[in-house]
Amino acid sequence: MTSRRNKNWNRFRCAFLAVLLGGATLGLPAQARVQGSAASPATKEFTDEVGRTVRIAQPVKRIVSLAPSLTETLYALGLQDKLVGDTDYCDYPADAAKKHKVGGAINPNMEEVAALKPDVVLVVKSLNRLETVRALEQLGISVYSTDPHSVKDVIASMKRLSGVLGAQEAGDALVEKLEERLATVHAKLNGVEAKRVMFVVWTEPLQSVGEKTFIADVLKHAGAASVVESKQDWPKFSLEEAVRLQPDYLVFASDHSEGVKNDVDALALKPGWSLMDAVKKRKIAVVSDAINRPGPRIAEAVEELARQLHPEAFGEKN
């Protein structure tokens, strides 16, 4: 693997590692109901997506995001001026990189977060640890958790969050835009046979995504069917097993498509990989890291992958 490729993939794996921590993540059942009763003249009670009752100061003026997808959502809702801090991995849009950094998503610096005096800290159940939430609450900081598992969940979550943050109109407009774009893609793919794909998280060891993950649902919306059938979120398996599955395409998430193609050229020279038809025929789809982030670029990720797997459906040459 090239050094640039390794660096890029390491960024994506940080999100996966939080899931692999198992019981360390938020483990409460998800709910979507928002309660509108006022807890005090200055606060309002909400039920977040893991069923916790959260009191949040109103109107919300200062927000800290502990997930790249949530940072992107805040920008999409026009709330970037209220974003006072985010993580080291919050790099989209470009302006997000200029925000005050509070460390990583898994182990943020609590002192840095507290110093920003946020009205609310936003987290994602599958990414941020329960210990982080508890530590913030002990500091008297409100924490609101999201918990999307599918494309539909992501859209509903963004709409719900817009209401919590006082940007319902912007949320409604964002949701309408995303649903229209997805509907256009679905219409073009109507009647098209799904491609058998393997989403590659890592090559050494070989790692993919399980059938219940958000990414697996993105694949379905893009006219793809994962050849990996696993209840685990991020299953690891042998190269021999991958060769046996013989996917039509290998799908990679990277901002450096040329780097991935060079890596595949190198893989083609290795024993085992050279037996995989997708490698021999260079059936490789490279999409942006938007596919890894359950946020406002989700429709973009679906369309980007769909165009590569089914160019004829979009009037393009294969």
Q: Residue locations for each model-derived region?
A:
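Extracytoplasmic substrate-binding proteins
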Residues: 43-46, 52-53, 119-120, 130-207, ...
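Short helices/loops that flank or line small-molecule/ion binding pockets
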Residues: 110-117, 139, 238-246
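A short, structured surface patch at a secondary-structure boundary
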Residues: 43, 61-116, 120-127, 132, ...
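His/Asp/Glu-enriched short active-site or ligand-binding loop at hydrolase and phosphoryl-transfer sites
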Residues: 87, 212-235, 254
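Bacterial N-terminal signal peptides
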Residues: 14-27
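N-terminal hydrophobic or amphipathic helices and topogenic motifs
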Residues: 12, 27-61
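Bacterial N-terminal signal peptides that target proteins for export
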Residues: 3-16
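Short secondary-structure boundary segments
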Residues: 67, 125-126, 201, 231-234, ...
